[in-house]
Amino acid sequence: MKKKQEESSLEKLSTWYQDGEQDGGDRSEKRRMSLKASDFESSSRSGGSKSKEDNKSVVDVEHQDRDSKRERDGRERTHGSSSDSSKRKRWDEAGGLVNDGDHKSSKLSDSRHDSGGERVSVSNEHGESRRDLKSDRSLKTSSRDEKSKSRGVKDDDRGSPLKKTSGKDGSEVVREVGRSNRSKTPDADYEKEKYSRKDERSRGRDDGWSDRDRDQEGLKDNWKRRHSSSGDKDQKDGDLLYDRGREREFPRQGRERSEGERSHGRLGGRKDGNRGEAVKALSSGGVSNENYDVIEIQTKPHDYVRGESGPNFARMTESGQQPPKKPSNNEEEWAHNQEGRQRSETFGFGSYGEDSRDEAGEASSDYSGAKARNQRGSTPGRTNFVQTPNRGYQTPQGTRGNRPLRGGKGRPAGGRENQQGAIPMPIMGSPFANLGMPPPSPIHSLTPGMSPIPGTSVTPVFMPPFAPTLIWPGARGVDGNMLPVPPVLSPLPPGPSGPRFPSIGTPPNPNMFFTPPGSDRGGPPNFPGSNISGQMGRGMPSDKTSGGWVPPRGGGPPGKAPSRGEQNDYSQNFVDTGMRPQNFIRELELTNVEDYPKLRELIQKKDEIVSNSASAPMYLKGDLHEVELSPELFGTKFDVILVDPPWEEYVHRAPGVSDSMEYWTFEDIINLKIEAIADTPSFLFLWVGDGVGLEQGRQCLKKWGFRRCEDICWVKTNKSNAAPTLRHDSRTVFQRSKEHCLMGIKGTVRRSTDGHIIHANIDTDVIIAEEPPYG
């Protein structure tokens, strides 16, 4: 029991003594000497194989210590602040990553514990046990140093600007650093930095008391800046911990960024106080800059850029992995910008490696960013310089000061900003170029003496029915569509208009007229209060005036088809000349059948059948009102019957002849005894006109015992009597130019047995022929 108490007291004393040794950074050499001595004694006491392995592991630890120290010192010269960020990551990520150094140190510590246990069991002397405990403690310290160095080396490799990090790693580091609220006071942050400096001094670094005071002041300032807007935690997630005192130690690094590096430049906005090496290290380490007004990109060296192929745009290395920025109100943005401007004025970080163009860009971007703060879609100070590998700095693709925007190829004007400034909108070209009118004049505002309604004192406004999109007058541009246009047509002469068709003369029926009196075809009606001097159309020039008829557009003699320049507009040609479109259909008869031998053979057989079986037609001239149709009248029944009754429609086709022509009513036509003279089987052809006769003719076929089997259409041409006059009256709306013939069949016919009445159906159901003079 006595020995156990003495051993426990000795362990406590050795622990206190070891903790006291840790407070002094100058005793690292003593610890190494004691480690060597204890290792030598333990190797002499333990077995041969174990001592060799232990000595080899100690020597490996020392070699690794020296190599990692040299590598870390060399990297700290180039990446000063990245080591500080790696220290902070080590403290914030308390239970985070487990490296290969941990496994090595844990194995060594286990072996040390085993050897220490053996030493305690072999010797019970106080001095030896004390030395063993000292060796254990020093070995633990060395393993902890090894773990911190391995983490530092890994973090340095991760923070290298030539090594890309994934978006997931960067976001995890941002989340760990940004949301680490365990250090609520600057004293706690200072304690963490003090412990990290002790580890560094145990490896041979001695920064001095001046560096320690400067670090403490920088940490306090950093804590005040970080916790000044603690209520806005979500927006400050990406606010990073960096040591401002370390930035003062590296003014030389900012100046060493020569013109060769400046040619590769960076893409930045409104400069903040974070313009020095800290922002470079943080942006290259994959950390988000979402709460900074500046985006600084560490570009690749010449050899690295030259090896790649791609468009001549700025290559976004790590800033493309930023999380989406949350919106903040205008007061917080203004306060943050003011704070960043004060920091830049106090510390002057914006002067390292910058030139006069950056300062000019800062002034102009501050001016434009302040104007766009009240707009939600704008991100102030987002991009101010776009750099390409072969052109250097370029002006931003957006409004800069009072200069107009300059669009680029790969992205819309202004980048991600959609601010609506005083953008000069291009005036669209006049849509009335084909009208042969002079260019539009500027818009004149209405004076109090001018009438807002169209009249003689106001120039009419031409509005096409299919106009482009209107650009209403406002801050962005002017109206490019509401343009005053001089009148195209001359005003109508006063007094009643002349006769519409002077060649026809006054019709006998005064109630029949072609156009409303007092108006001209194509001109405005004489309504009271109307003064329409322009024609609302699709931009086609007017070819008629109020003076009378003008020559047709084609300019050629009547009877010829319109030229290709008239776009084959047969309808317009019919209005101009009276020539119907069907007048220009060619090859109406089956004359050119030499190229079709089968068709020629079929036509020959058809003609033979017709000539062999056809009989001479029979007719009876008489008044069917008085003569009743019956088989006894003719002595036979007929296989084919043609009926052409005088429909009322025929009378109204020829103006002025209705008094001398008599027409039958529908009741008179349907009461004919056609079924009495029709044989079975038989066919009936009934002309019904082009109006109501189509339906009435079907009723007649049904009463007479026929069913409709075909509808033959007669397209009437007027090559011989073409005239620009439209022969219609108030009963018709369109000009009728065709007629229909309904074909009915009674009974059943077969080609095999009824060849005398039916044959090969090679004829078409369309007839194109000239019409008679009176329709």
Swiss-Prot record:
Gene Ontology CC: nuclear speck; RNA N6-methyladenosine methyltransferase complex
SUPFAM superfamilies, per database record: S-adenosyl-L-methionine-dependent methyltransferases
Compartments reported by the entry: Nucleus speckle; Nucleus, Nucleoplasm
Ranges of compositional bias, category Polar residues: 375-400
GO terms classed as biological process: embryo development ending in seed dormancy; methylation
Phenotypic consequence of gene deletion: Embryonic lethality: arrest at the globular stage of embryo development.
Transmembrane segment boundaries: none
Region (Disordered): 1-424, 520-569
GO molecular-function term, one example from the UniProt record: methyltransferase activity
Signal peptide: none
Keyword DNA-binding applies: no
Amino acid composition bias (Low complexity), ranges on this chain: 40-49
Keywords, sorted A to Z: Nucleus, RNA-binding
Record field: compositional bias (Basic and acidic residues): 1-10, 50-79, 100-117, 125-222, 229-278, 333-344
Primary location group: nucleus
InterPro entries to which the protein is assigned, alphabetical: DNA_methylase_N6_adenine_CS, METTL14-like, MT-A70-like, SAM-dependent_MTases_sf
Keyword field contains Ion transport: no
PROSITE patterns: MT_A70, N6_MTASE, SAM_MTA70L_2
Family listed: Belongs to the MT-A70-like family.
Functional note: Probable non-catalytic subunit of the N6-methyltransferase complex, a multiprotein complex that mediates N6-methyladenosine (m6A) methylation at the 5'-[AG]GAC-3' consensus sites of some mRNAs. Associates with MTA, FIP37, VIR and HAKAI to form the m6A writer complex which is essential for adenosine methylation at specific mRNA sequences. N6-methyladenosine (m6A) plays a role in mRNA stability, processing, translation efficiency and editing.
Assembly and binders: Forms homodimers. Interacts with HAKAI, MTA and VIR. Associates with MTA, FIP37, VIR and HAKAI to form the m6A writer complex which is essential for adenosine methylation at specific mRNA sequences.
Protein name: N6-adenosine-methyltransferase non-catalytic subunit MTB
Organism listed in the record: Arabidopsis thaliana
Lineage, uppermost ranks: Eukaryota, Viridiplantae, Streptophyta, Embryophyta, Tracheophyta
